[in-house]
Amino acid sequence: SLKGKKNFKIFDTRNVHKLPLDFVNDESIKTNLISLKDLNFELIEYVICSPGFDYDHEIIQQLKKNNISIKSDIEIFVEENNSKKILVSGTYGKTTVSLLLERIISLSGLDSYAIGNLGRPVLDYIELEKDYFIIEVSSFHLQISNNLNADIGILLNISHDHLDRHKSFENYVNIKNSLFGKCKVSIGNKNDKNIKRGLTSYFEGSEKIDEANLNAVSKVLEKIDLNCSQEELKKFSFRPKHRMEVFHEDKLGRKFINDSKATNCGATISAIKSLENEKIVIICGGQGKGADFSELTSEIDKKCEAVII
């Protein structure tokens, strides 16, 4: 157990932050820097792996070969924190749904907080107790997690993303569906053929991403006995930063929209579909991540006047 032990800090290999002086000057903290060949695997109980770390790295292969458990930070949090937990995953919409749940559950009088992949590292909150922690979970987390024992797990959608890491869409689908492994209640998108059948419950998907997100939120609220009508839910509807933000409108009525949070084809397709009866010029860029662009290309052909890459 981590509880009752000395506070610890987590650092990565990027030289963004310097080690704080209280860490450097603490003589009780013993630091050993060794190479992989000098590592005694018999002394290792388990390894906490950053979700961004290369899962094909030699050290990961050696850990597997020696049958050493590899855990994510979210897995450690789930094991150590006694609060009720709601896991939210999907190719897109995770942050919106997580923050909506945080807001609505909090307004009901329960103490809730959204953490995880949305920019709030879970281990910063490991010693806090809430009525509910809503945890945004990425496929990178799921790939290295074996025991996400939560009260509710909801999977919003699955479309092509991160195939440069996961090697194939089939692998990506299996990793996403592993969210449900040990969840007491499992919820999936009824209209997404890539989400496994036989779950506890399903919500109605929609091509309109805002509508699908509200349906997902409504289903989670139902499972924790906080029923809320669609009309009431719409009052809470919002988007996180950089999701379909209108940042300028000129004298001719042309709108300039920042949707830089759309980092995969599925999210971009949803954004295009949400602009009904509009003339669209789309600017795209970034890493392909091994994705299949055929569906996005088809949608651009149907609805966009021009595309700038």
Located regions from the model:
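Flexible active-site lid/hinge loop adjacent to a nucleotide/diphosphate
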Residues: L128-K208
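Short beta-strand "acidic-cap" motif of Rossmann-like dinucleotide-binding folds
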Residues: N7-D12, Y113-A114, I134
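Conserved substrate/cofactor phosphate-moiety recognition/catalytic segment
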Residues: S112-E129
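N-terminal leader/targeting and accessory segments in enzymes
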Residues: S1-S72, A291, K302
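Short internal beta-strands
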Residues: F8-R14, I187-K190, V281-G285, K303-I309
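Nucleotide phosphate-binding/pyrophosphate-handling subdomain across enzymes
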Residues: D210-C304
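Residue-level signal for inorganic ion chemistry
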Residues: L2, V47, I70, V88, ...
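Walker A (P-loop) phosphate-binding motif
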Residues: D73-G116
